[in-house]
């Protein structure tokens, strides 16, 4: 995974001053869609691998016809739905500010004062401000008069439709965006009414949006509050080690029974290359009385896939670790992009055991993180350009 902002997109970013479009003036949005489709067809290897071209073009025609009567949020969600029809986990429209310098903020939707997480048995409240702390641990059964399952399904249409694990990881964050909920018929105005259940007892809660300046760390936290906010509680009594913050992009630790290697991005560090870092972890694990290594990729959203060989070859050559029961790899729905390429290589070339959730993407997938910014609405859109297998 890499990040590339197209030349035209960069010009839009530098000149962006915040363009507001009147509800009936759909021409800027028509132009945004035209330019995005030009970029998509020029740079994506196969934009119709998931959705047949005829279906894709029909959806575009329906969106164009509806544009004059749509609100800004409805225009954004409609656009996002078209982008998501491409299907791959590297082609989608973020609903939150991307953590890259020089990009406009995106939709700028206000967020709820609680955080959700989607589990196998439903959507739960896992973080909340002190005022909503009584909601922690409750299962969400509805948004307004819409069942939670239907609400999740509506939002899933805005996320990569072929990369379902990736979509299931991020759908909880999308469900926190108040204007998005209103656009999808899941909220009325700036108030969101949730139906909740715990221990067989049901209740409702009316929630208002946070101030526009409140920003969550969408990428690497699942239950934290807005950045800088101290007024926050989580459902978990203790944060597990793998979710605890650490400096840099990687760490090596000694756990009971194994050396532990975790990285959140596959990249060279300031003082150490990726190859040097992973070689140090392998050497440390080999030096144990009973050599064992755990590689934790549960928070790794990708990086530079060309660096994977440094770890794979080090393990392939290790007689102490490259055997059954000595090497374990942990994965999750956030194991994405170049990290999926690493998982595939480890599966093919080592004796690693894999534990956890299925990865965000398929082993064969469209990748590269290119970022295009629409010229009028200033919405960053991520799109793939290469096929990896």
Name each model-derived stretch.
Residues 1-5:
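Positively charged n-region of N-terminal signal peptides that target proteins for export
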Residues 6-7, 285:
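N-terminal hydrophobic alpha-helix used for membrane targeting or insertion
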Residues 7-17:
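Bacterial N-terminal signal peptides
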Residues 8-10, 201, 368:
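A generic, residue-level signal for flexible/boundary positions that often mark functional hotspots
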Residues 15, 100-102, 308:
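Hydrophobic alpha-helical membrane context
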Residues 16-22, 387-389:
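Short, intrinsically disordered, charge-balanced linker/junction segments flanking boundaries
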Residues 22-292, 299, 323, 373:
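Flexible, low-complexity junctional segments that flank or bridge functional domains
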Residues 287-294, 298-389:
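Conserved acidic, small-residue-rich alpha-beta core segments centered on
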């Amino acid at each position: 995974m890499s990040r590339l902002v197209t030349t035209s997109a960069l010009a839009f970013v530098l000149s962006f001053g915040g363009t507001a479009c009147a509800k009936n003036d759909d021409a800027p949005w028509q132009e945004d869609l035209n330019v995005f489709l030009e970029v998509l067809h020029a740079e994506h290897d196969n934009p119709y691998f998931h959705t047949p071209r005829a279906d894709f073009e029909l959806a575009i025609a329906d969106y164009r016809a509806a544009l004059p009567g749509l609100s800004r949020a409805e225009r954004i969600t409609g656009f996002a739905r078209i982008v998501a029809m491409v299907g791959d986990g590297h082609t989608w429209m973020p609903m939150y500010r991307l953590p890259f310098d020089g990009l406009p903020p995106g939709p700028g939707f206000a967020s709820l004062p609680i955080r959700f997480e989607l589990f196998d048995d439903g959507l739960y409240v896992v973080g909340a401000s002190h005022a909503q702390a009584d909601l922690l641990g409750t299962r969400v059964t509805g948004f307004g008069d819409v069942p939670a399952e239907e609400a999740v399904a509506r939002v899933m249409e805005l996320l990569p439709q072929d990369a379902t694990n990736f979509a299931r990881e991020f759908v909880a964050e999308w469900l926190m965006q108040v204007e998005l909920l209103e656009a999808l018929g899941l909220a009325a105005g700036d108030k969101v009414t949730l139906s909740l259940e715990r221990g067989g007892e049901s209740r409702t809660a009316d929630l208002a949006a946070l101030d526009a300046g409140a920003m969550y760390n969408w990428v690497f936290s699942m239950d934290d509050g807005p950045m800088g906010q101290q007024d926050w509680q989580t459902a978990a009594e203790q944060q597990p080690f793998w979710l605890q913050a650490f400096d840099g992009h990687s760490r090596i630790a000694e756990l009971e029974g194994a050396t532990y290697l975790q990285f959140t991005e596959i990249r060279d560090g300031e003082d150490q290359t990726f190859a040097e870092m992973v070689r140090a972890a392998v050497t440390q694990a080999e030096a144990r009385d009973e050599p064992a290594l755990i590689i934790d990729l549960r928070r790794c959203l990708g990086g530079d896939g060309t660096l994977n060989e440094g770890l794979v070859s080090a393990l392939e050559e290790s007689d102490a670790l490259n055997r059954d029961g000595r090497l374990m790899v942990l994965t999750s729905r956030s194991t994405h992009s170049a990290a999926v390429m690493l998982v595939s290589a480890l599966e093919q070339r080592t004796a690693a055991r894999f534990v956890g959730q299925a990865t965000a993407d398929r082993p064969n997938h469209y990748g590269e993180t290119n970022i295009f910014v629409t010229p009028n609405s200033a919405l960053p859109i991520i799109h793939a350009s290469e096929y990896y297998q």
